Amino acid sequence: GTGSTGIQAAPVIAEKAKYLTVFQRTPNFSVPARNNTLTKDFKEYVKNNYHELKSLVKETPNGHAFRISEKLTFDIPQKEREKKYEEYWEKGGLQFRGVFKDIITDKKANDSASIFLKKKISQVVKNKEYAKILTNFDHPYGCKRPPIDTNYFETYNRENVHLVDIKKDPIIEIDKTGIKTERNYFKLDTIVFATGYDAMTGTLINLNITGENSLNLKDYWNEGPKTYLGLQIAGFPN
């Protein structure tokens, strides 16, 4: 898997394992997280501006404590636009989504950002075949949860890391000693399943909530979640 979990796990596993094989179905956009130790000045800034930051979280569409630019992508010349992309790439984290106001709402604006990200990833990954597989995106930037990473794409420059494109070479079978694809067999000691999880509805379903007429929430949501305004469920305790 190469969603947010796999993207975090792969670089760390690659440092310890003699050999790592990553099986990718869907390539994901990712921006460097730029994690670092919180400085004394930053801590003081947050404490001194806590209420303002809290208000900002409530005001922004994505619920994060950073402002989304009021500028539209094509309101500025290309050279200046590229400079802005570079600036936000260096900042890292989720802020890249806020570099321009229309990235998530305008297809051409999104294409501009996507092309930049594809270029940056291709610059990082030295193996051209891997770079092509990792940037063969089937969705606009931000339309799936965009992960952030620490040295994820750099990981594919290591000699002990191998990438398998399971769209071209699908997994057929997993047995006791490894994974069989349509064209190859990969003998493995350990398999890490980073294939996703039921993040939103899973917790509620596992509570075994029962409503009117002994109807179980799991059965009620059998064909997908149904709510009132995303807050209440008809016929169940709310």
Language-model features: locations:
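Hydrophobic/small residue at the entry helix of a nucleotide-binding pocket
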Residues: 5
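Aromatic pocket-lining residues of Rossmann-like dinucleotide-binding sites
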Residues: 9-13
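N-terminal FAD-binding dinucleotide-binding subdomain shared by FAD-dependent oxidases/monooxygenases
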Residues: 2, 17-238
